[in-house]
């Protein structure tokens, strides 16, 4: 089922990448996910927005997209995990046929599906989320049983995106509780081989839906920003390719994003 919100998401690019960022992106969320990440509010049993998801037939979907086009041509497909939507290829094609730009979020678990979408020119900006520095950490974060889902497949997805001409790739990881410079370096090394990839760091977005017993908290904002500045200074490959979203304000407001 879908949750659709008009002009809500701030594009996480500067505009220098040939992407129109004058308008925010419409958000199209799919309710299903194959991960249960500890920091994701949608994984919480307390998540209270489930009633905002609705089924849409093809004619209804087309009508909604056409109406949204009048106020902006950027569309962000997210979730949940949008590759689980059995109609995702058709949904994306509708947006592209109407002249839209597609930002596509994925946890990277389904690289073959993503490759199909890329090969058909249905993705303009691919955002892939990392779940840990090691396969073991990724398993613990994503709460899945098969390591390939949250590790090997993720790298395949990044590689497919990086090798697709004209597609921008953003790799995201979420920081919480504490982070060291050495950890940021290790994360950057994992994706450094993929030419042109952007490295995005989200400080934990606090939510009333996150159970307090998890003990998750934001990293000190100034400390994290200073570590990222150091990374860019010492590793020139990342200059103008690091994106920092410190809190939930930066999700929906462009001036809440720091580009380094």
Q: Where do the language-model regions lie?
A:
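Conserved AdoMet/S-adenosylmethionine-binding subsite of the radical SAM
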Residues: 66-67, 74, 83-213
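Conserved alpha-helical substructure of the radical SAM core
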Residues: 43-77, 86-87
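Short, hydrophobic beta-strand segments that form beta-sheet elements in well-ordered domains
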Residues: 28, 104-106, 243-245
